[in-house]
Amino acid sequence: MLNTTTNPFKPSAGHLPPVLIGRDLVLDDFREGLDNGSGAPGRLMRITGARGIGKTVILTEFRNIAERRGWQTISETASAGMAQRLLSRLQPQKGSFSFSFEPSVSISNVGGSLGGVHYERASIPLTLREAMSARLDTLEKRNVGLLVTIDEAQAADRADMVAIATAVQHLISEDRNLSLVFAGLPSMSSKWLNDNVMTFLRRAQPERLGDIPLGEVSNAFVDTFHSSGIILKGEPLRIATQATAGYPFMIQLVGYHIWRVVRRNHDLWRYCCFCGWWFVVELLRQ
């Protein structure tokens, strides 16, 4: 009998699965970055990998880790106007503002900022750097910081990336309690890291997400199904594990459909576990 009526596997884009397997090293790198303070490698990170490999899931878990420590987090997905949206979310809660975004600006009395983004209250310009600094002033009084994550970074406009990279570079040089993590397809590296204007991003700690070792997949299947009152072992377990090829999305998809069919066919599954493996074979063929 199943111990839960909710399928524990989540084969949908970006959904955080109940158990995140095979990513301990990258998660530990991020935690150490938060622990070790400004300038720690894990606070400036770039994550690459194929579609479906779990980049969005990792960013979600990073935000969860930071929020459990009291940090404020801002999540963005790269598209036109990303820097403008980031600035809007950083604006003070009071006042009347006029927003503008320019790929290249020159503002008197404000330090040089490539790809400057600013909004105005009266005649006082506020750059993205200043907006982030103002938010950090508040957060650092409570000994917490700000995490910004950017997904699909390979699709970002150059002006947006220049504005964000420039602001973050200045703030890191000032030892502010800030972390930036950006993720994208492998093409992101050649697109942004070879841009002379954004050499700062080359110093981001690289984390390449690959397939999950099959041994870890097998263990995760055993534990996850067992928590639902299902015994998956022997040949059925081997076939299910092999079918995933260690690909994170396939782990969720295979697990989801096995759990779904088991829920509908309790007696048949009981026969499969003790007398054969054809049940899983037929399921995976479907």
Language model feature labels by segment:
Residues 119-186, 194-197:
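Conserved Walker B catalytic segment
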Residues 67-73, 83-117:
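Conserved NTP-binding/hydrolysis module of P-loop NTPases
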Residues 46, 60-82:
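Conserved catalytic segments around the Walker B and adjacent sensor/switch elements
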Residues 246, 252-286:
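Winged-helix-like regulatory helical subdomains adjacent to P-loop NTPase cores
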Residues 235-249:
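A short helix-loop-helix "switch/interaction" segment in the helical subdomain of ASCE P-loop NTPases
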Residues 41-61:
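Walker A/P-loop nucleotide-binding motif
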Residues 209-236, 254:
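Conserved small helical "lid"/interfacial subdomain of P-loop NTPases
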Residues 1-43, 89-92, 106, 173:
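A short, basic N-terminal segment
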